[in-house]
Amino acid sequence: MVMADTNETTTDLVPTNQERMFALSQREAVGLSKSGLVPKEFQGNVANCLIAFNLAKRIGADPLMVMQNLDVIHGRPSFRATFLIACLNQCGRFTPLKYRITGEGDEKTCIAVANDIETGEEYEGPPVSMAMAKAEGWSTKSGSKWKTMPDLMLRYRAAAFFARTTAPEVAMG
């Protein structure tokens, strides 16, 4: 009997920690993909669930919470404003977000503001106005909440812009 010459050692046969973690994530993703509580983009789609698991791991969040607050816009994952606000408010870097609203009509503008907890320095996000909402087409889409809840939508958009420009690590890990 001739034994095959191999350079494999027994340690090559033992899965690495990374491989074990991926296998565990994959099993969890399969389970969640079968749930009716996850959004339709994740139902029956293990690959999308794995991407959500990756995002959750990077930002230290629960995978189901990430899935329920993630929208796919033009093929890219984008967190809902309420999720970004929650992440910012609990990250420990800033005071809770506040909003400055000025003007009326198309000139109504909202700026999200927070202070750095360590230094007290104030940070402002980019201004968001009703004129911007119209120019970008946000307020003219069918079923748009910009028509019925403009103040809330201004706050949401201003908060999302603040998160993306001032603290992108909060949502990207």
Model-flagged regions — what are they?
Residues 2-173:
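Polyanion-binding surfaces on beta-sheet-dominated domains and ring/shell assemblies
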